[in-house]
């Protein structure tokens, strides 16, 4: 009986390990393919970063592309809203990168001017420029807790979610923080952390394959 129970436990453990390894391989391959798509726009990224004196932020630009579109589609940096005030207007990758880098440069410049950290500028790429002044008034450094407060009490109600309702958002950062939730119309309070993670992925890829 004990042998049988041990065999069942052993088989169960093996199945779990196999599933975990298989899942890790699947996600690693999916990430690798997405990064390859992002890297395919190296020429356009270099041109835009040189144009806006953002050469030191190439990896960050790529991380934003990976975060926003995984290198697929036309509006790679989801730049339509910053350029036109609405989504799905830009339908050209080069235009999207040019506008995205321009907007990111504006956020970085404003964050430096206000004495805030780089993470604030990155989060403002998602929340909008007003977030920078908010961070300045609250210590000058972006945190998920501060971003959550802004999302819940300012951005979300401003865009119509007065009841502060939430929806499911399955990312490592969100699951560990609050079980996996964002506020409707409240942007992504985990944006800066996700971009930071993706920047490390970009850098690791380039060290291995470039």
Where are these regions (language model features)?
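Short linear capping/connector segments at secondary-structure termini
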Residues: 77-85
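Short, solvent-exposed loop/turn and secondary-structure capping segments
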Residues: 74-77, 135-136
């Amino acid at each position: 009986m004990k042998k049988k129970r041990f065999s069942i436990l052993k088989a169960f453990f093996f199945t779990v390990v196999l599933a975990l390894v298989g899942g890790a391989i699947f996600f690693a391959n999916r990430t690798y393919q997405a990064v390859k798509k992002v890297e395919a726009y190296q020429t356009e990224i270099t041109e835009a970063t040189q144009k806006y004196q953002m050469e030191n932020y190439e990896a960050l630009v790529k991380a934003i592309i990976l975060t926003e579109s995984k290198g697929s589609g036309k509006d790679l940096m989801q730049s339509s809203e910053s350029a036109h005030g609405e989504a799905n207007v830009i339908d050209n990758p080069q235009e999207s990168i040019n506008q995205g880098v321009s907007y990111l440069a504006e956020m970085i410049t404003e964050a430096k001017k206000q004495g805030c950290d780089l993470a604030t500028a990155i989060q403002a790429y998602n929340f909008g420029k007003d977030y920078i002044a908010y961070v300045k008034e609250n210590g000058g450094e972006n945190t998920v807790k501060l971003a959550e407060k802004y999302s819940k009490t300012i951005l979300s109600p401003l865009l119509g979610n007065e009841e502060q309702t939430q929806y499911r958002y399955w990312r490592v950062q969100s699951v560990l923080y609050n079980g996996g939730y964002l506020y409707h119309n409240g942007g992504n309070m985990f944006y800066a952390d996700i971009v930071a993670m993706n920047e490390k992925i970009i850098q690791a890829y380039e060290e291995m394959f470039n």
